Amino acid sequence: SIAKPCVNLPSFYLGAVTISSQQQANSALTLALKAEARALGFSACGIAPADATPEAAARLDAWLAEGMHGDMLWMEERAGQRGSPRALWPAVKSVVMLGMSYAPAGDPLALADVRDRGRISVYAQGQDYHDIVKKALKALARWLVSRSPCDLKVFVDTAPVMEKPLAAAAGIGWQGKHSNLVSRTDGSWLFLGAIMTTLDLPPDAPHADRCGSCTA
């Protein structure tokens, strides 16, 4: 037989898709990133491209026009930035969405009829989630920069970021009729955080809307 010359190429051919060495590296980085997120206490991690929610701005404008924001004037004041990740930070390419479960160990309604016990929302029974989630986000951000130098920003609830549509676009869950994100594994018991980065990471598939016919 005649030996064929060996040619080093920057990519390999798989089926009908050519995958570059950079894409291979980013895919491996993404898998490691998700494993690190789990190690830091996050129960969900997904990635969405920065332009994954083009309909969010229009929905926000309609919501504001109906006065649904009530006294939350800051929602209107920064609506332009809130509508899109790139409106907030033009350099962003990918958004890493993260969810940290705060599901209670028992049934929170079990004490509903106990009159000598106060009722405190489950999310408020522990430490301030802003501090807990942001600490984990910063740790994950440091890990990411150490593996692949990039610019990034972390967010948890206090910046003009539409976390729920982005989390749905990142495959973590879907936005239910009650407006909250619903995860098939964690329900609505998720604190959401985001890391915007200049890295072009492979995105996850958006989560389908699985709401039924309820009118709640």
Where are the language model's segments positioned?
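Auxiliary alpha/beta "docking" domains used to position bulky ligands
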Residues: 14-212
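TRNA-recognition modules of translation machinery and tRNA-sensing kinases, especially anticodon-binding
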Residues: 215
